[in-house]
Design a protein with these regions (language model features):
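Alpha-helical transmembrane segments
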Residues: 21-28, 147
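Bacterial N-terminal signal peptides
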Residues: 25-37
Length: 394
């Protein structure tokens, strides 16, 4: 029986030894976690998001305030976000003039502002940056709205949106910037908006809000070269100019913006009614993808690294997308309602967002850090902050 007793004792001793070994290992593991956290990568740990830091430069942005007839110059830097000065614009002292669109010249010497209201036509104004001194202005069509400028600064393209008139085809005004002369008025579609040129300056795109289409203008001929139907399930590219109007009851997209990609190979169109974005291939003139967006997606802007910033007019928010996949990378709430425009700084660090507000609310300018995808600053502006463009860095 002795061998059996010895065997039992040996077994118990081995068990006790295994227990001690396990306890020592557990203790060592605990010490490692407590005092050397970088030595072991825990499966559930995620890298921390980068924290926003104060800007090392000053960024200056112009914003037009539609109900206040004001142009605001805003500075964002290490001291925060503040309004540098405001300038009144318009000819009618007793009525709202309604500045809506704005574009800064490539040489940063001038800004061009579309003014929607007139008697009856609206106008576009040329001012000198910094002083905001008026150089000259010229009359255009009914409610000139979104404005863009050619890469060489020679022409501005203004969408005559005709927001308050009859539902009839309107136009894009082409204005020579040196003498502020309208050289061509190109009939496109009903309620054009979202006037944007491709980076090469060879094609102009605008959204046709009441025709569910996007129009393309060849800037060499100043004629409509193609159009693209955007209705859900009816997406189709066509050549030439459109020859008929849509019925109001048939509208499913109601596009408000057409934004070319950084290389001009794609155009992204915001469908304000259906809350999605349509990506169109410029070469084949076919739809590449259609992806969900925020409530009332309105204006679009490209970051320098190819992300797409979208303002959600009804959704009181701003979305950032990977437009190649349609994945929403972030959705940021805004301080006030009726989110309007977006512009990205040349160094790709920040996006500035204009918010109109409702009723007696002031307008707002908000700043998004594009590295952290967080809102880092806000400032009140005069009522109905609308179009905006970047001026310069200091």
């Amino acid at each position: 029986m002795t061998p059996n007793v010895c065997l039992a004792s040996d077994t118990q001793e081995r068990q006790r030894g295994s227990t001690r070994t396990a306890r020592i290992a557990a203790f060592a593991f605990l010490i490692c976690i407590l005092f050397w956290p970088c030595a072991i990568a825990m499966p559930h740990e995620r890298p921390k998001a980068p924290e926003s830091t104060a800007p090392t430069k000053d960024y200056l942005v112009y914003v037009v305030c539609e109900s206040a007839d004001k142009i605001a110059l805003v500075r964002f830097g290490a001291q925060g976000l503040r309004v540098e000065h405001e300038t009144h614009i318009g000819l009618m002292p007793m009525d709202i003039n309604g500045p809506h669109g704005i574009a800064v010249s490539p040489d940063k010497q001038f800004l061009y502002v579309s003014v929607g209201h007139g008697r009856p036509d609206g106008s576009v104004w040329k001012l000198r940056t910094g002083t905001d001194k008026v150089v000259r202005y010229t009359s255009l069509g009914l409610f000139p709205a979104t404005t863009d400028i050619s890469p060489d600064g020679a022409f501005i393209y203004v969408a005559n949106a005709n927001f308050h008139g009859d539902m009839v085809p309107s136009s894009i005004s082409v204005v020579a910037t040196d003498e502020m002369v309208e050289v061509r008025r190109v009939t496109t579609c009903t309620m054009p908006h979202g006037s944007r040129l491709n980076p090469q300056g060879t094609k102009h795109y605008s959204a046709c809000m009441m025709d569910d289409m996007m129009a393309e203008i060849d800037t060499r001929t100043f004629q409509v070269s193609r159009y693209f139907m955007l209705g859900t399930g009816k997406e189709m590219g066509m050549t030439g100019a459109p020859d008929k109007q849509m019925k109001m009851g048939d509208l499913t997209c109601v596009p408000t913006w057409a934004q070319p990609s950084n290389d001009g190979s794609e155009v992204y169109v915001a469908c304000n009614k259906s809350n999605d974005i349509v990506a169109v291939d410029v070469a084949t003139w076919k739809m590449l993808r259609r992806f969900r967006a925020g409530d009332g997606v309105y204006n679009l802007a490209m970051t320098k690294d190819g992300r797409l910033v979208a303002t959600n007019k009804r959704g009181q928010s701003v979305s950032v997308f990977d437009p190649k996949t349609g994945k929403e990378l972030a959705r940021l709430p805004t301080q006030r309602k009726v989110v309007h425009g977006a512009v990205v700084t040349p160094d790709n660090h920040f996006a500035f967002i204009s918010v109109e507000g409702v009723g007696s609310d002031p307008g707002t300018l908000e700043v998004i850090d594009l590295d952290t995808l967080k809102t880092v600053a806000t400032v009140d502006l005069p009522a109905q902050a609308a179009g905006l463009d970047f001026w310069k860095m200091e």
